[in-house]
Regions:
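Acidic, glycine-rich A-domain
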Residues: 1-166
Length: 166
């Protein structure tokens, strides 16, 4: 994912598009963290690249709050289009989620619907850990891709961005 973020960041910077690269982790609903590696106002420079490269996986994957926070930040940005691309290598899971329920998937869907009301659109990219049925709940209207090989992400992500924004 880091390599893909670096490639996309370089491409967006060369296009002159404003962008943010963030990450998130959680340990229960009261302990959600959102990390900013490159914010909208920062230049894409050596420091931004270093922060992306220093990112490490941590704790659990409570995606709904991260989407809401991304939407909150993006809502304040003047842009012709506002897009959130979520890249995940696993199912949404956290303490407090019943693994037999689809609560996490429905929370992501609700966060996407909340952002859509603000004219912010989301696209999800996942490994095969999520099924088509899971992804259709989280990212309705086929606004998702499932990659059988995450190593293809650096090649696919720039093409996807162009498709979503043109």
């Amino acid at each position: 994912e880091k390599h893909a973020a670096l490639i996309l960041g370089q491409g967006l910077a060369s296009l002159g598009d404003r962008f943010e690269i963030g990450g998130f982790s959680s340990n229960g609903h009261e302990n959600c963290h959102y990390f900013i590696y490159k914010d909208f106002e920062q230049e894409w420079d050596r420091q931004s690249i270093t922060r992306v490269l220093a990112a490490t996986p941590a704790e659990s994957t409570r995606i709904g709050p991260a989407l809401r926070h991304s939407g909150y930040r993006l809502e304040r940005i003047e842009a012709r289009q506002r897009l959130i691309i979520v890249v995940t290598d696993g199912k949404p899971m956290d303490s407090g989620y019943d693994p037999n329920s689809r609560y996490a998937q429905h929370d992501i869907r609700m966060a996407n619907e909340e952002n859509a009301r603000l004219d912010i659109h989301t696209f999800g990219i996942s490994t095969e850990a999520n099924t088509v049925a899971d992804m259709e709940i989280m990212f309705p209207r086929r606004r998702f891709a499932i990659l059988p090989d995450i190593r293809k992400l650096p090649r696919i992500l720039p093409q996807l961005y162009i498709r979503l924004t043109v």
